[in-house]
Amino acid sequence: MGREFRAAGAATDVTMRKVPLTESLRIIGRGTRNWVSDRPLVVSFEVTDACTCFCKHCDHGGPRDESRNLRPSDFPRYMEALRPCVVQVSGGEPLMRPDLTEIVRNIQSGNGLPYTILVSNWSLMTEQRYLELREAGIDQFSVSLDFPDDRHDDFRVHPGLYAHLEGLIPKLAALGHDDIVLNSCITSENVGEINAIADTARAWGVNLCYSAYSARRTGCRDYLLNSPEQLDMLNRGFDRVEQRRDETNWIVNAPSTLAATRRYFEHASAPGCKAGLRFLVVTADGALQPCSMQFGKYKLEDRARMVEEFTRHNKCDECYVSIRSYLDKTFPQLLSENVREFLAVKGR
């Protein structure tokens, strides 16, 4: 599967990059079974609530009580019960867990599943840790980027973060693994930077995914696109992005996803969410949540009750974050987009 089984936590991203054919077939096979049997396609493990940043658009930030966090040995039980084809490891900031490599190893099944994505701000990333996590089973590294310069530091409230990314990402991209994707959450603050951020991805030699801000996490509507001028900037920015696509598929979002993102911002809503069914969150202390912005908690063995109580009656239309946007499609559409993207990548 080339690109589009995708997901998000604080800055959620499930955007599958390049996957070998045998692994693609396993993912498609499990995804088909899960779709038919109402199991989740994507599970996001929020392995910590603590974070190194205090991002303006997020409800995480700073130290938290870590005493009740799941241990690495707890993860196989969740994997056996949920059997997702894609896993997102997120937070908070997952790199704050010193045992993160062990957690990743305990998520793996040994047969190429699940496809595993690390969502991080990369403030604590080093070359050694990148290589260790690749070896443990991380297939893709999703790195948050809000601005193409040190305004990123101000938005994330982390001085020096952009300089750290600018120094490290091109160096790791040059290793040739093609497993780094910048994730840019579009807000009223950075909507005019859509293509400048794309320029940065190109300059650093990595891929790019866009996601959409939701006010549900913090209650702050200031970062939504609240004016015709901002919507015009979004549309002109995405028009240019569409022109920049090429055979490398470095723009990870499918055209259908960007089109739906435009509609979300235009209407300030996106009905029809299947949180809890197609995707779900496992919190740092092991509870199930339908998503990272719906806070009803369920035990692992009560997943079916969560679907019945929440998903079947869910009227929330307040987000179009990545974890939702890439699964908010019919199964034939989801399958065809993944197969088409895979064949495009293999044909290079």
Q: Would you name each region that the model predicts?
A:
Residues 3, 267-270, 285-348:
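Flexible mid-to-C-terminal extensions adjoining Fe-S/redox cofactors in radical SAM and related proteins
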Residues 3-140, 233, 341, 348:
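Conserved alpha-helical substructure of the radical SAM core
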Residues 57, 61-64, 279, 297, ...:
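Secreted/processed peptides and extracellular or luminal domains of membrane proteins
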